[in-house]
Amino acid sequence: MDLALLHPDFVRTARRVSRPLAQAMDAVGPPDWPSRHQQPLARYLARVVVGQQLSTRAASTIWGRVEALGKAEQQSIPALALNLPDATLLACGLSAGKLKTLKALAEADAAGVLKRQRLARLEPAARAIELTALRGIGPWTADMLALFYFRDPDIWPLGDLAVRKTLERFLVTQSRYDLSSAAALFAPHRSVLALYM
């Protein structure tokens, strides 16, 4: 999907929602949409879980320790959660809850639940149901996976506070649109709207 080609249409649609939104989109230009699917899905999910509810700096530090441990022990992530002592992983800065989630991801990966090709064929809603059945994976994580790993074109992550707050800022008080109805104007490319936010 060429975001540069979509950009003028997005600005026009944004103008229907609010002039400040259109001006902001026009000023920033087409967003980047980084692809994360080069790495194994289980590893990507592990990285997301490790970073949840932490500052970027803390998440990066802890993930760096986990990566270094995996390299030193010649263990893949998250499989190392099943193969190394809990104390070793907790010493990296992981919480007990995140360690349990990494173990669940490793088990799911070993069972074939996290096969990228299989999950990619599912509709995003069906995929989200499967993923949120895993320990520690909630709707926000499923949405981020749909956006950045699978690059589904029409994901509107209502659970993402930054996305919601940014769009709310542009909805003027007299606007006839609320968050959902404003986002609906951008279907079937609401993922791109989320990237602008």
Briefly describe each language-model feature range.
Residues 38-43, 81-82:
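Short, flexible turn/loop "capping" segments at secondary-structure junctions
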Residues 8-12, 22-23, 54-133, 185-187:
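Alpha-helical ds-nucleic-acid-binding substructure associated with the helix-hairpin-helix region
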Residues 34-39, 53-55:
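Short secondary-structure boundary/capping segments within folded domains
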Residues 46:
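Phosphate-handling catalytic interfaces
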Residues 1-35, 100, 120, 124-125, ...:
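C-terminal accessory module of base-excision DNA glycosylases/AP lyases that mediates lesion recognition
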